[in-house]
Regions:
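Active-site helix of classical SDR
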Residues: 149, 153-156
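C-terminal substrate-binding subdomain of Rossmann-fold SDR/epimerase-dehydratase oxidoreductases
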Residues: 202, 206-280
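SDR active-site strand-loop-helix element
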Residues: 16, 40, 81-87, 122-128, ...
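N-terminal Rossmann NAD(P)H-binding glycine-rich loop of SDR-like oxidoreductase domains
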Residues: 13-33
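NAD(P)H-binding glycine-rich loop region in Rossmannoid oxidoreductase-like domains
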Residues: 61-102
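N-terminal Rossmann-fold cofactor-binding loop
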Residues: 40-45, 64
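Conserved Rossmann-fold NAD(P)-dependent oxidoreductase catalytic core, especially the SDR/UDP-sugar
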Residues: 87, 108-149
């Protein structure tokens, strides 16, 4: 592998979980900078057609439970491995403990696959859920006290993959992604569900919207991910966000002004939950 003065010269990257908002934005970001991409897609995924193959983008069908097959499927090897793939990211599945435990195994399998592919660098996608409830600006030095299975598994995956990478002499970078919005965002996210309801002239029901939230556009998140692949420091955790938090109500008001001014937003219709995060 070739190195440049400021970091790795990335020629080819592997991405698991590439069909979401960040994954697709990262594909575009890497290709725009001359990096070939291998997108690892679940067999039978309804979102597989989002991956537009070309001379620069190759699609490989492989389930998270079979990542050990990747070295056979990607004969050309790679330099950087982005592991975004994760089962159970919404609703009750976040507290499916056996399912979340499997995600930790899959993350370790991803390290094994990355090593077999000759990757110098492994970058994992963690979450703000690793912190639990915290009143203040999030950064890598804030203690992590996750309160659901999803956050616990993400924290564990980050720590275990770091040790696994160290054992193999690979650079390890863990990201804690705050709130991302953009094209191909999940239908269950606050931004997308609010937009859909407003476009259908339905009243969105919300909390009071006093939570302080940090939103980042997916294209900007992808830029951060590319730069981490090139220049990120081994062993560090990076929070991926804009660095500026605003009351959630402000974001929702902006959506309302642009999507449908004639619909009243139902602020306060939904009470805060017992484990409500008020600062993200």
């Amino acid at each position: 592998n070739q190195y440049i003065e400021m970091g790795i010269l990335m020629k080819r990257a592997v991405i698991t979980g590439p069909t979401g908002s960040i994954g697709l934005a990262l594909i575009n970001e890497l290709v725009s900078n001359g990096v070939e991409v291998v997108a690892v897609v679940r067999p039978g995924s309804r979102r597989a057609d989002r991956i537009k193959t070309s001379d620069m983008v190759k699609r490989v069908d492989c389930d998270l439970s079979e990542l050990n097959k990747l070295p056979e499927l990607i004969r050309e090897g790679a330099d950087v491995f982005y592991h975004f793939g994760w089962d159970g990211t919404f609703g009750n599945s976040r507290n499916n403990m056996y399912g979340q435990n499997l995600n930790v195994k899959y993350a370790l399998d991803a390290v094994e696959a990355a090593f077999a592919l000759g990757c110098d660098t492994f970058i994992g996608a963690g979450s703000q859920a690793e912190y639990g409830r915290y009143e203040g600006s999030l950064n890598e030095s804030v203690p992590a006290f996750p309160e659901n299975g999803y956050g616990i598994a993400k924290l564990c995956a980050g720590q275990m993959t770091r040790i696994a990478c160290k054992q193999k002499g690979m650079r390890h970078i863990w990201t804690r992604i705050l709130s991302i919005y953009g094209p191909y965002d999940g239908e269950n996210t606050m931004v997308m569900s609010t937009i859909y309801k407003l476009l259908n002239s339905e009243k969105p029901s919300c909390t009071k919207g006093e939570q302080m939230w940090d939103f980042l556009y997916s294209k900007d998140a992808a830029l951060a991910m590319r730069l981490l692949g090139e220049k990120g420091t081994d062993g560090r955790t990076y929070c991926i966000g804009s660095g500026k938090a605003r009351p959630l109500k402000e974001y929702i008001d902006i959506i309302g002004q642009n999507a449908n001014k004639n619909v009243t937003i139902g602020y306060g219709d939904i009470p805060y939950g017992p484990l409500q995060v008020m600062y993200l």
